[in-house]
Amino acid sequence: MSILILEAFYGGSHKQLVDLLQEELEDSVLYTLPAKKWHWRARTSALYFSQNIPTSEHYRILFASSVLNLTELAALRPDLGKLKKILYFHENQLVYPVKKCQERDFQYGYNQILSCLVADVVVFNSVFNMESFLTSIGKFMKLIPDHRPKDLESIIRPKCQVIYFPIRFPDVSRFMPKHKAAHLQKILSLKENGGNAPSTALPFQQQLRGSENLLKSFDSKSGPCDAAQQESLGCSVRQASYLKTFNSSDDSSTHHGEHKQNRCDVLAEADDQQRPLHIVWPHRWLEAVYCGCYPLCPKDLVYPEIFPAEYLYSTPEQLSKRLQNFCKRPDITRKHLYKGEMAPFSWAALHGKFRSLLTAEPREDL
């Protein structure tokens, strides 16, 4: 086996990616740790892997997510340190998830910076993820009281590239209206390249109450917006409710807290696809849109990179107005055909980039 794949947090999108790579790429072997207690995975997984990965003269490439402290592993296992080392960022600890510096554990972000210095190639799942990480390095290192290292961004940036998270879209046409199923086939067969991006958190705590009250009033009385119309509010209102729950949760898994089930599988089972969408991982939104959801996203973070302008809002007031309009006019979302692109995010479009990435250059010292 020439490709060594390591995943220190084997769950959610981390699991989804490495399972796909191992299935599609011959000559690979996968070592993992369960997706729990991520803090401890980030701190100690390198030592565990160093003791449990057998030595092999056939390894040529090491692929790992940024949960792993690649620096420690390379030091503990010099044989692995000689491989072509690829580090994949699902999220970065310089901007996600904690916003306040005093609440952030310096070590996690510092370890990711060190891992980038050791890696041969650093891959991010979006331009936003890459730029937010690279441009935060300087400010982050100023937290060191004195004798600060310099020029880290300029050292790391040349190694960096963006390869979007690859989605293997299943056939969900039997769950969808015919006009949407036909449109789905059309947009998936279009050109297969990807897109560009910006930063901050979602603001809609206040407007959330108004949206929930709106739904309650529709429950309590009949009128121009009946139960069927409530359905078309679907993802957006429930997304807001989910975010409130997500933001208040203190479960230790929230750093990597995606639903473990593939969003396509979940939504395919749901009538009108009324499921909460995740705030951080853009591929979860794309999976939902693929299943017929109307995306309504903040004009911030990674979303402008993925979705056309008509699906973005800038203020809580705009969000509230859009939701109320959807409630009064449910046909807008029912009949809507997504105007963005899906093909650039499919495995069919991205497999060539991953195959090229996971091709070893000859190394004399192996």
Swiss-Prot record:
Q: What is its EC number?
A: 2.4.1.110
Q: What is its main location?
A: cytoplasm
Enumerate the subcellular locations listed in this protein's record, separating them with semicolons.
Cytoplasm; Nucleus
| GO CC terms, sorted | cytoplasm; nucleus
Under the heading Pfam families, the entry gives: QTMAN_N
- Entry's Gene Ontology molecular function annotations: tRNA-queuosine(34) beta-mannosyltransferase activity
> What keyword terms does UniProt attach to this protein?
Cytoplasm, Glycosyltransferase, Nucleus, Transferase
Function, as annotated, reads: Glycosyltransferase that specifically catalyzes mannosylation of cytoplasmic tRNA(Asp) modified with queuosine at position 34 (queuosine(34)). Mannosylates the cyclopentene moiety of queuosine(34) in tRNA(Asp) to form mannosyl-queuosine(34). Mannosylation of queuosine(34) in tRNA(Asp) is required to slow-down elongation at cognate codons, GAC and GAU, thereby regulating protein translation.
UniProt name for this protein: tRNA-queuosine alpha-mannosyltransferase
Origin species: Bos taurus
* Classification lineage: Eukaryota, Metazoa, Chordata, Craniata, Vertebrata
